[in-house]
């Protein structure tokens, strides 16, 4: 330990040295503020103090001095963000100072020997609220509150944002001489000459809070008096301190019998059974070090190899009228260090540096002394993450305590802007037809993945990028086509020229800088850069195309005829329907929803399925609340296993032309008394054959099993070799949809029940689920006149986790939550007309995307996990767009929304709906386990709430990502779980990406800089380049 006491570090006068009543160190550890009896607040350079022994050190010692009080200054405190400096004096006034970036206007004070100021600290506010001397001050950890106490026995709470008086607490019966805040931001404690310490519970107020909002805030939690029953009233202060882990309060001027002591109050039950005895006279102040310490030197690789870390302790310094500085820690019952006669008079205040290795002591003899410890003397300083972990059990952390106006904040902002600029250059290069430099600029993304050219695989190999499609439309052609649409002129009957109206969203432009909502048809073949990850759709392949408009549905009581497909409609040739009906935008293909061909269909014979007869309807359907149309009995059904596309009418001979193509063929007899035959062939060779007593309606299969659903409501399964896997499953009615995905099988029956089976485990994740809830919800939005038909089921799929995904003809998309046992709506037309992110072309966060992940069956991502639910959310939103455009409601509803925005009270409608849409996407991606979509939508959401300056949501998002800050004592799930992973991503990686996006918003630096420091994101340019090179080598 080194004691440093420069002769110039004092409040000296012409004839004597004035008392120093208070001292405090700034959060960045660069400034020391002192206050004394000369009525001055002085700001010193900590670096100059540490180098006082160096005669060659020429930098300024005193940075500034302020004399805006009319008497003795008793307390001086920096705000946790370093933005403000508060002082309280015996003139009953509290002064708030802030650092002006402009240089000081004067060189030195006239008539004094004061050195010229280096920094320009100006008076920002003068707070009037006390009737007597102000004895002590304290800021809340999140800077939202400033609390002052004084000799008028009052506790005055001020807003840390507006400095308005929020509340006055008059609960003490004598002078209040100490105040300290809980680092978890839940309580504060005050010490008084009435020989009590009172604990107050509070909720951090909003920046614009007023006195009326604080009526029920700041509630007295408890009052502690046992350790102070016989404490003397001769001390000038009773400065108490709260431990950095939130477990204890150290209270000065306590007694244990006849001996002066320091009382340690435990947070759990507010007990005060522990006393620190080591002073011969009453103590004035005790102060915990802001850092936790290891009792033994920790191993650098302890976290990597899973070894247990050494125990953590807190360190406390105390001093008082015996002129002795005593250092304690929680690991020993005796003091670690005792320094006697450290001053010639009483010690009035203590202040630790942020690193916890130096403590300053202010004395009434007019001097300030620094005790600087070497590494290991007090212990080994733990990382700041340990403070956060210790505070998590109390529902708080050191959030928002970062310095906003320091170099770290500038580094974070520069890093954020650099990443955004690289992404912008990449997108601009792609639009201008110059992808080379753009790919070079964005060779490395934030997570280390290289998306350009070749993508690094997990085993070190490289995978070539897919070739570009030659038929893609360039950006210039797209602009010309849009301009042509805008300038399309029509001539009316009276000869006047009029410009044809164009849907605003189709032009791709907008007045706002925010993403514009666009309803883009899925049939477009141009390479539109959207905000959806380019991944393979994780849904079962709909080989059996559903009728146009989906499977018709009827709910009980709608007074309409039972919906059954008419013979005339089905027997109408497909070519005639294509010529007379509306042009489809998308069609059901082998791999899901595919764009419809823009060119005219080829001439010749159009294959048409041969229907034998309608299926026999089960009598149960007459008593069901939901009734779905049942498919007709077809003469034969072909189901290929490979990716080759085969029409249902293709003969077995044509199917053998597809190499390695395994085909399951079901042949139904013309007579009902004959059995149905089902065969599996490979290259025309028979693999296996089986017979069923009833006609087969639907077939499905994967590489794990085959399945067939029959007219009598039975469901049969076979292994790939043709071995029956289980007895026939008896369904309540005829099947209408049969889908397979990996080991999962979905069967939807005519009464609207969805059955899901895991063939590998021979189990079901949940009982049969009815479609009635989603059809009822859809029906409530129909016209009261009943002119709009009931929505039909356009598709029902399974993902690789066995989750049901259903779309309706009104555009709504749903999935069934196996954890909530309820249907949840993921996509609807409400977002299409109100959100700015619907089919948005804004891809400002596309530089943060990872490369696409391969199919579920074989490909793995970098984390070793399959890409579950990939592409489901974009697929459902494209379906909503398709149905929206087909029904012609887009233009009308967008006009209604624009008219709504012009009304009073709806100014923030579009912004609120857009943010809610992103939250809906994030919730859906998280519930489905869509790893890529979750990360992308999370970054889009962070960028938007940062631009909207929604600090509450930003703080909650950062706390949720860091893990467990908002959870209760019991372990939760999802966001509130104790796991290090969140939707397959490491929480630290997600937090780093969000902090990087939010780094450019200076108003949020109070929240983001602290997280950036934890993640080592506040490095300079040279350090940053070194770190980036290391990341590239690692990747």
Swiss-Prot record:
Residues 408-425 have a biased composition (Basic and acidic residues). Keywords: Chromatin regulator, Nucleus, Repeat, Repressor, Transcription, Transcription regulation, WD repeat. It is found in: Nucleus. SMART domains: WD40. InterPro entries: CAF1B_HIR1_beta-prop, HIR1-like, HIRA-like_C, HIRA_B_motif, WD40/YVTN_repeat-like_dom_sf, WD40_repeat_dom_sf, WD40_rpt. GO terms for cellular component: chromatin; HIR complex; nucleus. Residues 393-479 are annotated as: Disordered. WD repeats lie at residues 15-54, 68-107, 129-168, 171-210, 232-275, 299-338, 342-383. CDD domains: WD40. One of its GO terms (biological process) is chromatin remodeling. Belongs to the WD repeat HIR1 family. Required for replication-independent chromatin assembly and for the periodic repression of histone gene transcription during the cell cycle. PANTHER family: MEMBER OF THE HIR1 FAMILY OF WD-REPEAT PROTEINS, PROTEIN HIRA. This is Protein hir-1. The gene is hir-1.
């Amino acid at each position: 330990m080194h004691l440093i006491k420069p002769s110039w570090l004092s409040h000296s006068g012409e004839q004597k040295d004035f008392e120093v009543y208070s001292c405090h160190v700034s959060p960045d550890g660069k400034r020391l503020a002192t206050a004394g009896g000369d009525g001055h607040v002085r700001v010193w350079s900590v670096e100059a103090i540490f180098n006082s022994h160096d005669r060659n050190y020429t930098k300024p010692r005193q940075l500034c001095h302020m004399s805006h009080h009319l008497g003795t200054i008793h307390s001086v405190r920096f705000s946790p963000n370093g933005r403000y400096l508060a002082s309280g004096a015996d003139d009953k006034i509290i002064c708030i100072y802030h650092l002006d970036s402009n240089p000081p206007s004067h060189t030195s004070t006239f008539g004094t020997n004061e050195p010229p100021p280096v920094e320009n600290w100006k008076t920002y506010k003068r707070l009037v609220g006390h009737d007597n001397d102000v004895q002590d001050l304290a800021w809340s950890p999140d800077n939202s509150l400033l609390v002052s106490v004084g000799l008028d026995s009052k506790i005055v709470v001020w807003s840390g944002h507006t400095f308005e008086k929020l509340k006055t607490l008059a609960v003490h019966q004598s002078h209040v001489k100490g105040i300290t805040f809980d680092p978890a931001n839940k309580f504060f404690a005050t010490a008084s000459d009435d020989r009590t310490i009172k604990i107050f519970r509070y909720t951090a107020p909003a920046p614009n809070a007023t006195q009326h909002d604080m009526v029920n805030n700041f509630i007295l939690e408890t009052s502690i008096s046992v350790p102070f029953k016989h404490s003397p009233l001769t001390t000038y202060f009773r400065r108490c301190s709260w431990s950095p882990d939130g477990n204890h309060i150290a209270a000065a001027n306590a007694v244990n019998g006849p001996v002066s002591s320091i009382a340690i109050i435990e947070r759990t039950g507010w007990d005060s059974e522990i006393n620190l005895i080591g002073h011969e006279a009453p103590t004035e102040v005790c102060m915990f070090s802001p850092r936790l310490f290891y009792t033994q030197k920790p191993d650098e690789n302890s976290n990597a190899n899973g070894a247990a870390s050494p125990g953590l302790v807190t360190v406390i310094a105390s001093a008082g009228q015996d002129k002795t500085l005593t250092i304690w820690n929680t690991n020993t019952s005796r003091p670690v260090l005792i320094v006697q006669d450290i001053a010639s008079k009483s010690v009035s205040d203590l202040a630790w540096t942020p690193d916890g290795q130096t403590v300053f002591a202010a004395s009434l003899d007019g001097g300030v002394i620094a005790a600087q410890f070497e590494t290991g003397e007090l212990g080994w300083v733990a990382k700041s993450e340990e403070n956060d972990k210790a505070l998590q059990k109390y529902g708080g952390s050191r959030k928002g305590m970062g310095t906003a106006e320091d170099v770290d904040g500038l580094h974070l902002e520069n890093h954020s802007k650099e990443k955004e600029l690289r992404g912008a250059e990449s997108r601009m290069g792609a639009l201008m037809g110059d992808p080379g430099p753009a790919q070079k600029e964005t060779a490395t993304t934030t997570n280390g993945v290289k998306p350009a050219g070749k993508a690094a695989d997990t085993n070190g190999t490289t995978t070539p990028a897919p070739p570009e499609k030659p038929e893609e439309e360039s950006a210039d052609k797209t602009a010309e086509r849009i301009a042509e649409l805008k300038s399309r002129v029509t001539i009316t009957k009276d000869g006047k020229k009029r410009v044809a109206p164009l849907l605003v969203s189709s032009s791709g432009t907008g007045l706002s800088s925010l993403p514009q909502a666009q309803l883009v048809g899925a049939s477009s073949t141009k390479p539109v850069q959207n905000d959806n990850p380019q991944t393979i759709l994780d849904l079962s392949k709909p080989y059996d195309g559903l009728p146009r408009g989906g499977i018709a549905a009827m709910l009980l009581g709608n007074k309409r005829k039972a919906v059954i497909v008419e013979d005339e409609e089905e027997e109408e040739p497909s070519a005639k329907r294509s010529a007379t009906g509306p042009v489809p935008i998308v069609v059901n293909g082998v791999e899901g929803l595919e764009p419809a061909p823009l060119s005219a269909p080829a001439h010749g014979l159009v294959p048409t399925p041969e229907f034998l007869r309608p299926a026999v309807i089960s009598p149960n359907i007459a008593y069901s609340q939901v009734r779905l149309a049942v498919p007709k009995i077809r003469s034969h059904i072909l189901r290929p296993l490979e990716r080759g596309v085969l029409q249902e009418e293709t003969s077995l001979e044509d199917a053998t032309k597809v190499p390695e193509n395994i085909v399951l063929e079901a042949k139904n007899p013309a007579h009902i008394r004959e059995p149905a035959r089902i065969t599996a062939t490979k290259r025309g060779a028979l693999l296996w054959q089986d017979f069923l007593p009833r006609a087969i309606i639907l077939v499905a299969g994967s590489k794990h099993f085959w399945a067939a659903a029959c007219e009598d409501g039975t469901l049969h399964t076979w292994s790939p070799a043709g071995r029956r896997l289980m007895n026939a499953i008896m369904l309540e009615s005829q099947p209408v949809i049969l889908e397979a995905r990996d080991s999962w099988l979905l069967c939807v029956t005519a009464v609207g029940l969805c059955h899901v089976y895991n063939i590998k485990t021979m189990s079901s994740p949940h009982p049969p689920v009815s479609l009635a809830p989603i059809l009822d919800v859809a029906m409530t939005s129909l016209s009261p006149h009943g002119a709009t038909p009931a929505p039909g089921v356009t598709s029902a799929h399974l993902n690789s986790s066995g989750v049901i995904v259903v779309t309706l003809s009104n555009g709504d998309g749903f999935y069934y939550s196996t954890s909530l046992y309820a249907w949840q709506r993921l996509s609807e037309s409400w977002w299409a007309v109100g959100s700015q992110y619907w089919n948005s072309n804004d891809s400002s966060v596309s530089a943060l995307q990872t490369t696409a992940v391969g199919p579920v069956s074989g490909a793995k991502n970098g984390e070793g996990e399959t890409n579950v639910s990939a592409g489901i959310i974009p697929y459902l939103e494209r379906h909503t767009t398709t149905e929206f455009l087909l029904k012609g409601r887009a233009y009308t509803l967008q006009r209604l929304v624009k008219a709504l925005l012009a009304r009073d009270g709806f100014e923030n409608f579009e912004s609120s709906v857009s943010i809610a849409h992103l939250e809906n996407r994030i919730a859906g991606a998280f519930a489905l386990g869509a790893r890529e979509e979750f990360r992308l939508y999370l970054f889009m959401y962070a960028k938007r709430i940062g631009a909207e300056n929604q600090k509450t949501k930003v703080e909650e998002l950062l706390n949720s990502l860091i893990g467990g800050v908002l959870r209760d004592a019991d372990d939760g799930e999802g966001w509130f779980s104790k796991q290090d992973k969140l939707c397959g991503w490491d929480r630290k990686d997600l937090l780093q990406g969000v902090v990087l996006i939010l780094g450019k918003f200076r108003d949020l630096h109070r929240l983001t800089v602290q997280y950036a420091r934890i993640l080592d994101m506040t490095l300079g340019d040279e350090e940053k380049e070194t770190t980036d090179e290391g990341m590239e080598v690692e990747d």
